[in-house]
């Protein structure tokens, strides 16, 4: 039984069979409540919040590495990096950071100017350089996936054109390479074209030709796969997972039930004939947001980042309310002081289960971090053990000295 049908049964099991017979329920035609008037209270999900919190160390380390790699010669004076701590979000001094992750950088003396005294510089360590070489190899292997993501983002846009600057701003969300416009785009002139002057910030990436292989959403692919496995034609629809203890008011339950019964509207389909305030347009927008999040590395994107694409994807000004209105599909985390939209179905007990192949690069980086941190912890343990032995020896020596003094007095 499709998951959305099981969800309908939980909403109203007595009416479910009757409502499924008609894809255009009468209640939708007579419903007076507008979409925007239906409110759902936000509810904290600690497990999903913890997924964001766990990535904090990785994000900080990656920012520091990028900062050094962006410097000429991939080297920077230690004190210069210290001055950028606040901007990098580094909560400890740079020296403390380097001691915790000793395998990321090498410290060496050099002069900032020819006739000045040498000062500490840092540069990528052999271990970090080895990772960078591996990253380049993995990116080459996964280039078809990156190309597909880029084409899909363009195919969903209104005019099949997106400002290059906006795509560069989300490169880390979707796993795009830093040199996206100069390395990837020129390789595929039959699919992509850069228009304008990149240096002036007035360039646009344009879709040259439509590829039907890319014009199928994750939800449609999932329905096709279920049909292949079961031999029964499956209707594409959203996976709905209401969090434990979450309660919807009656009018909202009825609206969600009827809304789920509407035909799925692909984000790649022409929606020019849909009324902006219609439930069908709402379903298309949810499908669009679902697809964009599905294309992201971690199945989550900051809401302000998504808001920058309102014009390209025809999001309404109140698009962010969609996430809370469909709390069984999305979750909005407030961790880190920023709203982050997450796909519920991609996580299980706070762990990401729908893993993007490009996460292999991130996993290798985390492994390198853990190796360095374990080395740091081992040094601390060795130091503590040595101090403990010294204290024991001192105590033993003092005890023997006291015994000798007592013997002399006798």
Language-model region placement:
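Long amphipathic alpha-helical repeat/alpha-solenoid cores
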Residues: 2-410
């Amino acid at each position: 039984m499709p998951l959305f049908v099981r969800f309908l049964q939980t909403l109203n099991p007595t009416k479910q069979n009757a409502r499924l017979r008609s894809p255009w329920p009468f209640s939708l035609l007579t419903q007076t409540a507008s979409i925007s008037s239906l409110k759902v209270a936000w509810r904290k999900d600690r497990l999903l919040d913890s997924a964001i919190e766990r990535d904090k160390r990785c994000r900080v380390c990656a920012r520091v590495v990028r900062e050094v790699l962006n410097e000429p010669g991939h080297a920077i004076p230690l004190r210069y990096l210290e001055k950028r701590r606040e901007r990098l979000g580094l909560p400890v001094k740079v020296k403390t950071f380097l001691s915790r992750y000793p395998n990321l950088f090498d410290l060496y003396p050099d002069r900032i100017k020819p006739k000045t005294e040498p000062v500490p510089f840092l540069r990528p360590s052999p271990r970090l350089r080895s990772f960078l070489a591996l990253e380049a190899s993995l990116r080459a292997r996964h280039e078809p996936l990156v190309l597909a993501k880029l084409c899909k983002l363009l195919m969903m846009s209104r005019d099949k054109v997106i400002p290059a600057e906006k795509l560069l701003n989300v490169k880390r969300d979707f796993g795009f390479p830093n040199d996206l416009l100069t390395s990837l785009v020129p390789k595929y002139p039959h699919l992509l074209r850069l228009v304008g002057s990149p240096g002036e910030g007035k360039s646009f990436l344009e879709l040259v030709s439509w590829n039907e292989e890319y014009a199928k959403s994750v939800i449609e692919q999932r329905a096709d796969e279920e049909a292949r496995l079961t031999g029964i034609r499956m209707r594409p629809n959203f996976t709905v997972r209401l969090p434990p203890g979450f309660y919807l008011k009656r009018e909202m339950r009825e609206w969600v039930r009827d809304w789920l019964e509407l035909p799925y509207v692909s984000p790649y389909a022409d929606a020019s004939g849909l009324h902006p305030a219609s439930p069908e347009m709402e379903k298309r927008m949810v499908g669009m947001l679902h697809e964009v999040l599905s294309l992201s590395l971690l199945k989550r994107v900051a809401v302000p980042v998504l808001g920058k694409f309102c014009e390209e994807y025809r999001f309404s000004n109140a698009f962010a309310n969609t996430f809370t209105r469909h709390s069984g599909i999305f979750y909005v985390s407030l961790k880190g002081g920023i709203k982050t939209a997450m796909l519920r179905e991609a996580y299980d007990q706070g762990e990401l289960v729908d893993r993007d192949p490009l996460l292999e690069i991130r996993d290798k980086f985390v492994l390198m971090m853990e190796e360095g941190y374990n080395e740091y912890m081992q040094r601390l343990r060795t130091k503590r053990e040595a101090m403990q032995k010294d204290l024991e020896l001192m105590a033993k020596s003092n005890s023997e000295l006291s015994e000798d003094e007592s013997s002399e007095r006798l």
